[in-house]
Amino acid sequence: MKTTHVLLVDDNPADADLISEILAKHGRPCRVHGVANGVEAVAFLRRQGKYANEFIPDFMILDLNLPGKDGRAVLAEVKADPVLRKLPIAIFSTSEAPQDVTCSYDLGANCYVSKPGNLRDFISAVTAIGEFWFGLAHLPREEQP
């Protein structure tokens, strides 16, 4: 079974660590690559600088409220790029604002999940994301150059 590569873009280290830990326990081989802001996310996806030797991820979990280039800008840039636009992107944000949900889908997000405030629900949400995207959904796989 091929390892699924996930790009996790979240500026909260505690959330990022917990998400990585939950996905690693999912049962399917998974490698989570974490970055803390939108500039790093785009550099990772374009394999620039220190990310030149990284794999293009199979899936991305993206927070909206990031320092510098926010998640909306990252989403717009990725979905406008002919090489990257097929990358499935799940928004995982503390925002429950209808305008953030609508904007994310308008920009091409594949799903929008609000981060729960309590630990049990947070774990359940990340587990559900993993079960759907790694267990049910078929992820597009491009040949790695």
Go through each PLM region and give its residues:
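Conserved acidic segment of CheY-like receiver
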Residues: 3-14, 19-24
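Residue-level signal for the "D+5" position in two-component response regulator receiver
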Residues: 34, 66-69
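Acidic, metal-coordinating helix/loop segments flanking the phosphotransfer/catalytic sites
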Residues: 34-59
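Active-site residues of response regulator receiver
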Residues: 62-63
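Short, glycine/charged-rich "phosphate-handling" switch motifs in NTP-dependent
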Residues: 110
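C-terminal output helix
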Residues: 117-128, 137-143
